Every structure is written in C-alpha cells, then in structure tokens.
Amino acid sequence: MLEVNILDKKWYSIVEDPKGFTLNIINASLKELKIDQYKPNISIALADDNLLHQLNLRFRQMNKPTNVLSFPCEQLSSECDLGDIAISIDTVRKESDEYHIPIPAHVAHMLVHGLLHLLGYDHQKKGEEVVMKNLEGKILASLGYNMCAI
C-alpha cells in the first residue's frame, strides 16, 4: 500500500492533485523497475523545509533542510514495509528555480531518487552514483521527463 500525507498546502500550488501525482510516479517507477508485483508499503510525506530540517538534523546530523530523505525499513519482499520518503516543497521549489527545472519534473526526480534509496541504491561512491543516476534517468525517461541536472 502506498500512503501519501500532504503536510503543507503549498503542494497544491505545484500540481492540482499532489497525492495522485505522487502515486502515479511511484507506481510507474515500481512498474519500470519490474517490482510492482511485490506491492510494497511505502509512506510518503509531502512536507516543507521545517520538517526536513528536523529530520536531517536528527538522523544525519546536518543542521539544514534538504530536498528528499528516505528511511528504509525492510528489504523488498511481498507486501513488505519498504520505508518512508519525505520531500520538502520549499527546497524543491528553490532548486527548480535555481536550475531552471519545471517543479513537477523535479518532484518526480526526488520521488524516484527517494524510492531508489529505499531499494538500497546509494550515491556515496562514484560507481554507486553512476549506477543510481543512470537508473534515475531511465525511470524518469519512461515517465516522460528528462534527467534533471541535480
């Protein structure tokens, strides 16, 4: 089951139906990854800088907001609790302006990025980063988006 919690009304200024948009991106990504049959449980918080700052400080000891955080729970299996994703509308909006990326495309990128972290992908090392970025690009292309420059 996919759960989407809209914690900031600013999300409605991005897309008319933030929950539907989020569900479509995650479901299409799971299908593109050929793992939709597992029907994983994922909770997604569409939040703001305040919450992402708190979470980033608590779990990563970084005293600043960030665009997306992922909290893996279980490894992929049938109906597993895959984990949680939180995205800040404020940081995503700033990055979209800075890099001239349409906001919905950047939100899609952050959702895919967060999902890949739940699945165990990382970008701490160069080789891992290349694998993750290539997979992000493939998924985003399947959704009709160009790979964003972040």
Swiss-Prot record:
PROSITE patterns recorded: UPF0054
Keyword hit for Hydrolase: yes
Subcellular location: Cytoplasm
Co-factor binding details: Binds 1 zinc ion.
Keywords: Cytoplasm, Endonuclease, Hydrolase, Metal-binding, Nuclease, Ribosome biogenesis, rRNA processing, Zinc
Pfam families: YbeY
Positions with a binding annotation for Zn(2+): H113, H117, H123
Family of the protein in this entry: Belongs to the endoribonuclease YbeY family.
Protein name (database record): Endoribonuclease YbeY
Organism name: Wolbachia sp. subsp. Brugia malayi (strain TRS)
